[in-house]
A protein has these predicted regions:
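An acidic, low-aromatic, low-complexity terminal/linker signal
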Residues: 1-150
Length: 150
């Protein structure tokens, strides 16, 4: 097992913690305002903008919209997590990236039935990090399908 597959990226949306396998991450960017083009949005596909990344435009998805999470973070202060997909890279708009953590720091947690019903399929797992529930972010529920190549 690679070192990257044993690590998780922790990020926040509206104060809620999420974790993401590091193997899915290409890069984290925090200076994004000048690189965004909201005119290239496709709300039907969940794309809120396009991001100029390494001389190409990639779609930007805001999971807070699908999850109905309110955020007080202004767009210019948000962070982008660039993810690998089968059709190319795509970007995830988040409020902040907290840190990296090793997989052994997380404990499995049973997801309550009512929460399973309420999530509308956007997530299916929760893990605990020092007693704080973290939603396991499953990129395939938000945009396209994800490539696990390193």
């Amino acid at each position: 097992m690679s070192v990257a597959s044993q690590r998780k990226l922790i990020f926040r949306l509206g104060g809620i913690g999420f974790l993401l396998d590091l193997t899915e991450v290409v890069e984290v960017l925090d200076q994004i305002t000048d690189a965004l083009d909201p005119g290239r949005s496709d709300i039907g596909q969940g794309i809120v903008s396009a991001l100029r990344f390494r001389q190409t435009w990639i779609p930007v998805v805001d999971p807070a919209l699908k999850l109905d999470i309110f955020s007080t973070v202004k767009l210019r202060d948000k962070t982008v997590v660039v993810l690998r997909g089968h059709e190319g890279n795509w970007a995830l708009l988040v409020d902040q990236v907290d840190r990296l953590s090793t997989a052994e720091n997380f404990q499995p947690c049973e997801m309550p039935f009512l929460l399973k019903v309420a999530t509308m399929g956007f997530y299916s797992q929760i893990q605990l990090l020092h007693s704080e529930p973290m939603i396991v972010f499953e990129p395939e529920h938000y945009y396209g399908s994800v490539s696990k190549s390193a």
